[in-house]
Amino acid sequence: MSATISLFHIVINTLRREMTIPDETSEHMYRYITAIIKNKDCKLFRINGIGNHIHMLVGLSSSIALSDLVRDIKQGSSKWAKQQVYFPNFRGWGKEYGAFSCSIRDKDAIINYINNQRVHHRQKSFEQEYQDMIERSGLEW
């Protein structure tokens, strides 16, 4: 029996980083995205965010490429959200996304980080947070 795990911290942002996912209705978006991820045979460990972006910790199935999963999440949830009363100002997702490979040993720390998004963003903008993530990963901003 094969056993694999590819763990990714994925970040997607709204079009033009506009605050179009209200806190009061964000759980509807999270549930819809959770269903997409589950339907792709991937495991969602945590999802959370604020009005202009979402963080996900995902165990990627060996049957799907990371870029295909992100595309399916963005396309499916965008089409759905535009039809919902919960997101009257939602126009879609931005073109870019971040996906950072993670060690299973860091899973709990990343879940904690995702859980505390509202706290992080009292002190840091999305742009600052994203730049920090890119630099910590050894990539260029």
Predicted segments, located by residue:
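Basic nucleic-acid-binding interfaces
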Residues: 1-141
